[in-house]
Structure formats: C-alpha cells, structure tokens
Amino acid sequence: MRVKVDREELEEVLKKARESTEKKAALPILANFLLSAKEENLIVRATDLENYLVVSVKGEVEEEGEVCVHSQKLYDIVKNLNSAYVYLHTEGEKLVITGGKSTYKLPTAPAEDFPEFPEIVEGGETLSGNLLVNGIEKVEYAIAKEEANIALQGMYLRGYEDRIHFVGSDGHRLALYEPLGEFSKELLIPRKSLKVLKKLITGIEDVNIEKSEDESFAYFSTPEWKLAVRLLEGEFPDYMSVIPEEFSAEVLFETEEVLKVLKRLKALSEGKVFPVKITLSENLAIFEFADPEFGEAREEIEVEYTGEPFEIGFNGKYLMEALDAYDSERVWFKFTTPDTATLLEAEDYEKEPYKCIIMPMRV
C-alpha cells in the first residue's frame, strides 16, 4: 500500500472513525483501523462490533492495499505532524507514516484479522443532521446507564402521527422531543451509537436512514461516510401512557433562575442524588435542601401562583439535567400529586416541542 493524503482531511476522518473503535475490548483488533487504499481513496473502517463505520478521504494512490493499524496511535501521529500532506506506505509488517521531516513506523496486523462488516445499504428516508443532533441532545441524558430492561439503554426513534419522536427514559424520568415531520421506521439506538452518530452528523445537512431486512441494523449514510448500528433488542415501553394530562398545580419558572438555585443547593450535597423539596404557596416557590451531615439551604422564587399550597420532592440532579436541555427561557412545571409524575414543558411548545416527565422522591 502506498498513498498520499491531505493531512488535515485525514486527521478529520480519523477523528470521526476512532469513536467507533473499542480500546478496552477483549479483542485487540477492535482498537485498530482497517486502512484500504483503493482507486482514488483511502478508506478507513472502524468497529466495536456495535457500530461499523466506513469513511473515506481522497488520496493519490500509487499502490493499492490494506492493513490494520492501531487507531489512537495513528490519529495522534497524524494530528501532530507539521506538514500539509501525509504519506503512508507498508514496509513488511510496518506502516510507515511520513510528513515533512518526520517518519514513524507502526506495527500492523493482517487485514483478514479485521471483523467482517455488514453490507451497508444506502438510501431510505432522509432526516436533517441538525434535527437528529437536536433530538439526541434533548433526550440522551435520560437514557438508562444500567437497567435490567435493555430497551431503556438506548434512544427510541419513530414517527408518530405528524411528528417524529425522540425518546429516552431510565424508568425514573422520560424525555420526549417531538418536532413536526415524517418518519416511517422504528429504531432503538444504543447509547454509545448516539455518541458516534452525533459526531458524524454535526453540521451535516441531510442523513439517509435505512433498516436491514432482519431489522437488526440501522444504516446511516452521507456521501462521505456510512455507519451501520446494531439496534437494541426488546420493545420500548408505552411511554405515551405515562405522560400526565390533568394537573392540580402549574407554575411557569424562569429556566436560568431555577438552574442557578439548584446549582447552589447542590453545593451542599456530595452524592449523585441530592433531594430537593419544592413548596408552592401564593406567588411563592420555596426550594429546600437538608442533610444532617452537610447542612441546610432555602431559596425563594417569586412566581405567579394562586392555587392551593403544594409540596413535592425531587432528585435535584434530574431537574438540573432536564432544564439544561431546554432552549426556552421559561419552562412550565405541571404537577399532579406529590406522589405522581410531574411534567416539564417549554413555555411555547410549538416553538420547542420538548417535554420531560420526572417521578418525585420522598424528602
């Protein structure tokens, strides 16, 4: 193999591809890229056996060939070379990387040791890259990190009536972003795949999305790259049934004001969970934290509220993460009872069609 590539373009390609590698895998080959010099391109393949990425960069190919090389080492070298172009060629069982006055040699592995890739089907439906990024960012914080129900370890993407639903839940909270649009597929995309996908689609106008015939893979593609994602098995819970529709108390809060209050309260807590009690009375909301070991705090916010006195407790971390996902300057808190789910919703829902449902906790 012998190829000449623009250094900055190669760096960008390797930066994207390394997200799909597995650095701590039992199979060392998963920490490698498969490089293929063919016709007028250098093709880079990377996989962790959940995500299969193929991305290419234009190059001057003098000799075709392919080889496996450690992904992070190659990326670090290319990133720090002080040259406009990078020259890659194989020399026995080494990959020689040259740029300017610098030369590096990395050990390689045979191309046949690299995992076989699924045949990635291009085409299908098209969604804008910005829409996908927004959807992922709105709901990824609510996705379960450790959950017996494997279906909760990913984002649920589907069309629903005249909207597209992006959904994440860990059983204690649920985030739903539902912009207007059409989408006919149902995809349950793993948490790590969302990280890979988000880096690929940021700044991209359109992304093609297809699904394998056996429904085990989703295929995302643009002219520059192709990604096959192994979908999660299982059925996502009926999330629509848990969204409350009737409320006993509603308050419109300034998003940033509540976030600052919660951050100050969190300063007294040393655990991941910090209980916050919210008490509503006429034109006043009180946020309180109390811990025998770490102290007590009380914050008051003036609000427009004329209903009956109301008291409820939350994991403050859940409130902070939900509010962080809003662009809206003001957010509705819609309460049912102290023991049932609360709905957070943007002031102008048509402008920002995003809601979060949070279960209360005893404080």
UniProtKB/Swiss-Prot annotation:
One of its GO terms (biological process) is DNA strand elongation involved in DNA replication. Pfam families: DNA_pol3_beta (PF00712), DNA_pol3_beta_2 (PF02767), DNA_pol3_beta_3 (PF02768). Keywords: Cytoplasm, DNA replication, DNA-binding, DNA-directed DNA polymerase, Nucleotidyltransferase, Transferase. It comes from the Bacteria. It is found in: Cytoplasm. CDD domains: beta_clamp. InterPro entries: DNA_clamp_sf (IPR046938), DNA_polIII_beta (IPR001001), DNA_polIII_beta_C (IPR022635), DNA_polIII_beta_cen (IPR022637), DNA_polIII_beta_N (IPR022634). GO terms for molecular function: 3'-5' exonuclease activity; DNA binding; DNA-directed DNA polymerase activity. One of its GO terms (cellular component) is DNA polymerase III complex. Its main location: cytoplasm. Confers DNA tethering and processivity to DNA polymerases and other proteins. Acts as a clamp, forming a ring around DNA (a reaction catalyzed by the clamp-loading complex) which diffuses in an ATP-independent manner freely and bidirectionally along dsDNA. Initially characterized for its ability to contact the catalytic subunit of DNA polymerase III (Pol III), a complex, multichain enzyme responsible for most of the replicative synthesis in bacteria; Pol III exhibits 3'-5' exonuclease proofreading activity. Forms a ring-shaped head-to-tail homodimer around DNA which binds and tethers DNA polymerases and other proteins to the DNA. The DNA replisome complex has a single clamp-loading complex (3 tau and 1 each of delta, delta', psi and chi subunits) which binds 3 Pol III cores (1 core on the leading strand and 2 on the lagging strand) each with a beta sliding clamp dimer. Additional proteins in the replisome are other copies of gamma, psi and chi, Ssb, DNA helicase and RNA primase. NCBIfam families: dnan. Belongs to the beta sliding clamp family. This is Beta sliding clamp. The gene is dnaN.
